[in-house]
């Protein structure tokens, strides 16, 4: 039988003596744990980390002790080192009570917002993005390009920055960085990636380093950079925004699909203007391979000029640089027209010695129609019934343009100032465009002011502006509707 062993008898004094050190130890440990887990207050004050929304590239903020470096691994010192040093500065009490400390919180604008990067030929690349406008206006940021090959080698290149938005930028301005190497950095076709260093100022010590483009092994094809190209003509549309009329988009698309022919392609950029109704009228053309719609709605996070128009047209220019012989830039309330029986092929053949040409507009009224009871206006297309042209001359009007993209480094909304080659402006007898301003977002009936039939033969003053009758576009409507029906099988009889 197992015997119970009684515990030794201890006095109360001894128990208390042993318990007190244990309790003190536990309290001390608890206090240490609490202090350990407190958030680093001053570290938060000076943290340079920023949220990364919709960024897919790897970014490293680096600090250089010298501008001479040999490899990607050797020339980075984490910015956290500087952050820690700054934390110590804020933690210490200034010895001089009159010395003020400036503590930054957050970031007002990014140093660089990458939209796209594209190979521009065997030895050149273009990186397109946004950058803080104050930095470029008041500072001297600069860039450096590097190609890191999959075979382990690397090569650096000169970088030239272009600011193509004519000073219209707001918080952000558009930046196109051209990287030109002495030879093809992927000549062995093993693949690699293009790295961009974006410097904050003249000093080479602080910059952001990120990947802009990657080429897989075997993907490089030099034949893509010389004719024949995939298309004869490419349309690069600006940012589509607002409450766009699906009817106006359908008319515009049918007309220009006919005008440019089967070897053409249209690129639209949806900044909020491609509603389900607009998407529905574009969908048949998308399925036919004639249209691409790119979703750029996230551009609204970056305050640039007019829905970042300059950013969008530059991205389109470089993305499709070798896709077509000619790239056209104009809006969806504008219709390209060839007067005097000209053909597009003959006109562009004549203009081919120029890198770009600009196009003069015929400004049309958005409200004036003929009061004709025989016309069923609600069923007619916009350019079928808006037939009055502003007849003022010798005033400056905005022009649109077409460009041989292979010879352009950057572009604008109305023309490019960064090209190799000549620009032709005297084109009005060969090609023009009809501009139906203030119609693209009108969903109700366009004919809101009626003029008598006699207005066809005289000048009409409306809102103190002279208008004359011009039915050149109306004469094409039957042809365009038949073309649309043939291409898409669309019943246009009930079109409104």
From Swiss-Prot:
<dbReference type="GO" id="GO:0042546">
    <property type="term" value="P:cell wall biogenesis"/>
</dbReference>
<keyword id="KW-0333">Golgi apparatus</keyword>
<keyword id="KW-0812">Transmembrane</keyword>
<comment type="similarity">
    <text>Belongs to the glycosyltransferase 92 family.</text>
</comment>
<dbReference type="GO" id="GO:0045489">
    <property type="term" value="P:pectin biosynthetic process"/>
</dbReference>
<dbReference type="GO" id="GO:0000139">
    <property type="term" value="C:Golgi membrane"/>
</dbReference>
<feature type="transmembrane region" description="Helical">
    <location>
        <begin position="22"/>
        <end position="42"/>
    </location>
</feature>
<keyword id="KW-0328">Glycosyltransferase</keyword>
<protein>
    <recommendedName>
        <fullName>Galactan beta-1,4-galactosyltransferase GALS1</fullName>
        <ecNumber>2.4.1.-</ecNumber>
    </recommendedName>
</protein>
<dbReference type="Pfam" id="PF01697">
    <property type="entry name" value="Glyco_transf_92"/>
</dbReference>
<keyword id="KW-0472">Membrane</keyword>
<comment type="function">
    <text>Involved in the biosynthesis of beta-1,4-galactan. Can transfer galactose residues from UDP-galactose to beta-1,4-galactopentaose in vitro. Forms specifically beta-1,4-galactosyl linkages and can add successive beta-1,4-galactosyl residues to the acceptor. Beta-1,4-galactans are abundant polysaccharides in plant cell walls and are found as side-chain of rhamnogalacturonan I, which is a major component of pectin.</text>
</comment>
<dbReference type="GO" id="GO:0071555">
    <property type="term" value="P:cell wall organization"/>
</dbReference>
<keyword id="KW-0961">Cell wall biogenesis/degradation</keyword>
<dbReference type="GO" id="GO:0003831">
    <property type="term" value="F:beta-N-acetylglucosaminylglycopeptide beta-1,4-galactosyltransferase activity"/>
</dbReference>
<dbReference type="GO" id="GO:0005794">
    <property type="term" value="C:Golgi apparatus"/>
</dbReference>
<keyword id="KW-0808">Transferase</keyword>
<dbReference type="InterPro" id="IPR008166">
    <property type="entry name" value="Glyco_transf_92"/>
</dbReference>
<feature type="domain" description="GT92">
    <location>
        <begin position="232"/>
        <end position="464"/>
    </location>
</feature>
<keyword id="KW-1133">Transmembrane helix</keyword>
